[in-house]
Amino acid sequence: PYGPAAGPNTQLAQNIIAAYAAGSRFFEVKTVQVMDGEELSKCVSKPCITAADECYNCEWSTELYVPQAFAEYVKAWFACKLLAKELELGDPDGFVFNMSVGYDLKGIQSPKVDAYIEGMKDASGTEVWRECMDWALANLDRFEKVDEAYVRGITPHVSNSITESTLHGCPPDEIERIATYLITEKNLNTYVKCNPTLLGYEFARKTLDGLGYDYI
């Protein structure tokens, strides 16, 4: 399966839904960190990517507050489950949401980010999950193939995998500490992201050229 990496394209529910309808099945939802919302916007000018073609996505984390980002991802998850059944877009369990968190262990262990991780692992006790469930049950007449049993059977386990995102210059032992924490304490299938800025210019240049992107 393929799909969008964490970025502006996986920040809002409607963008994730559009990607799913277009054929994507693996979604790395936009990175969250302890610095969010207004605090982040004062630190980093947004948006910090503008491109008419392929580009490096070395952007920071979500422009939303962490609870807002969580709500977007849950809404997208629920909507994709409904669309999979209603529009017969394939196995309703045939797509994956992959969390992305950064950028240091202290921030990832903060109550804010920890609540996000636990909510993505099981959203059943959250307000946004109840809102999605209530809406779907109240609007069953809009569907032809979705019934009450299907809606109530939608799993609240939005994600059991996570991508560790770190900034260039992050010490290797810090990367290892984060990965160890996510695997052993959070019990998550863990990916370590190697951004172009971490790989070095020569490797990134050779890789792009080899794929035909020599004009970048």
Where are these regions (language model features)?
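Active-site entrance/lid segments in N-terminal catalytic domains of soluble metabolic enzymes
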Residues: 1, 5-216
